[in-house]
Amino acid sequence: MMTMWCLTLFVLWMLRVVGMHVLRYGYTGIFDDTSHMTLTVVGIFDGQHFFTYHVNSSDKASSRANGTISWMANVSAAYPTYLDGERAKGDLIFNQTEQNLLELEIALGYRSQSVLTWTHECNTTENGSFVAGYEGFGWDGETLMELKDNLTLWTGPNYEISWLKQNKTYIDGKIKNISEGDTTIQRNYLKGNCTQWSVIYSGFQTPVTHPVVKGGVRNQNDNRAEAFCTSYGFFPGEINITFIHYGNKAPDDSEPQCNPLLPTFDGTFHQGCYVAIFCNQNYTCRVTHGNWTVEIPISVTSPDDSSSGEVPDHPTANKRYNTMTISSVLLALLLCALLFAFLHYFTTLKQYLRNLAFAWRYRKVRSS
């Protein structure tokens, strides 16, 4: 037991040292009210949404596969058939998903919406070694079956949920009917193709850089002002800047205005937003970049308060200000006294020297 614990700690330490990449694909098939099916595939690498495939059964010819981040242009340049291959793969998966949706809707019944999800994920080290994998299928937001841990055994859902419990026989039968060969194919994919592409993506990927955020108040006039919030140096360029007032988003009549998203010379981006607000109110600027969020408090005082020379909520600063004022007055009085004394002394000395010179001349005249 102790040996396994030490081995687990060692593996976790190694992952921390060498780093780890996570490549995940999520497939979502949906039947709408008109029995048309849509399939959307989303690729995420290290938290960056890099790929999307979409098709609708009403127009299969319009299926499209697109890179959704700047470094995917380099992947497409290095592998010219990449997007065509992903589109062809998506078209095949669409046909399988349509059949599975029909089967599940008949077996499990129509609920709030007929939604089939499928996720697979592989975790690799920086040097391309496979660490862990995952395969899972879900229906209407609940997991039906999963392949994880050592990737040899499929497990079922949480049967405490009533509608899953009602269909336990069907679900257990589906899991039991998964052949060892099918499981091997999934395992080999996660350890092979998925891991290989994770290494390829890591060579083209631009690392995530979260922004430096600054907020404050400007253009203050009477009882109105602008609260601004600017984010610098972030990548990728997808960012959300909102203003929160008393725990809620800014009201509709004061929606924030955002400047265009602009690139910088180092490949990152910056963007600023502002909102018109009343004075004597507290706002919070909330910036979300991927799974990273920061909040900057912004307080606005009225011009009357700011012109009084007082610093709100800082009595120590007020006391320091008063002390400095008194010291300045005393110093000025002392300098005036010294200047007066010097002028008085200089005038007296000048008069004394003049009298002394006159007496010397008078003595010299009498002696002659």
From Swiss-Prot:
Its main location: host cell. It is a single-pass membrane protein. InterPro entries: Ig-like_dom_sf (IPR036179), Ig-like_fold (IPR013783), MHC_class-I_related (IPR050208), MHC_I-like_Ag-recog (IPR011161), MHC_I-like_Ag-recog_sf (IPR037055), MHC_I/II-like_Ag-recog (IPR011162). The keyword Repeat does not apply. The keyword Lipid biosynthesis does not apply. Plays a role in the protection against host NK cell cytotoxicity by interacting with and modulating the activity of the host inhibitory leukocyte Ig-like receptor 1/LILRB1, which is expressed on monocytes, dendritic cells, as well as subsets of T and NK cells. UL18 exerts an inhibitory effect on LIR-1+ NK cells, while it stimulates LIR-1- NK cell. This is Membrane glycoprotein UL18.
